[in-house]
Amino acid sequence: MAKISKRINKIREGVDRNKLYDLSAAIGLVKERAVAKFDETVEIAMNLGVDPRHADQMVRGVVNLPNGTGRTVRVAVFARGDKAEEAKKAGADIVGAEELFEIVNGGKIEFDRCIATPDMMPLVGRLGKVLGPRGMMPNPKVGTVTTDVAAAVAASKGGAVEFRVEKAGIIHAGIGKVSFDNAKLEENIKTFADAVIKAKPSAAKGEYVKRVSISSTMGVGVKVDPSTVKVVD
């Protein structure tokens, strides 16, 4: 326990919990304090002035990060016939219809993102209790219900990140790896923040973006001055 406390204190050193850092400085602090023995993910948290309990204040969408996420994304596609073949050629990890339904319905989730052609949704919709809580239910609003399965697979593999506001009004997302250079992380963060701003619901009143912070997987959060991520209401 003493070793853990010492490590945590070392990570926290030099980070003022009450200060808003400009984005470039915050990225530097996060990278300097990423001491895990693996390539940690850099994550962003945005506190929004919305109440997601109301349907007209839901914030969700998808954004293609210019420098990818650094993750290997496993993609499942529900499709038949030619569309199934297109998905396979595009690099989908798992492709199927009824047989894939049975696998997923049995609780075996060996993928990170799920895509479906429109004709498959009556079947896929029955997996709501399995895919819904994991945020994997295909949705046309984020491009995962589509006839262009090849493009959807390519986007998923190439850096597409879905976002959805949580109950407390917070959006979390991984936007790169500690091994990325600072400029690439900054570009990804600004691209992500811009997408969240553009997804602002018309019913949201007052201050939309309340707080922004970034961290690494095992690190502490560093508060970011929203104006430095081009966040303007």
Swiss-Prot record:
Pfam families: Ribosomal_L1. Keywords: Repressor, Ribonucleoprotein, Ribosomal protein, RNA-binding, rRNA-binding, Translation regulation, tRNA-binding. One of its GO terms (molecular function) is tRNA binding. GO terms for cellular component: cytosolic large ribosomal subunit. GO terms for biological process: regulation of translation; translation. Binds directly to 23S rRNA. The L1 stalk is quite mobile in the ribosome, and is involved in E site tRNA release. Belongs to the universal ribosomal protein uL1 family. Part of the 50S ribosomal subunit. This is Large ribosomal subunit protein uL1.
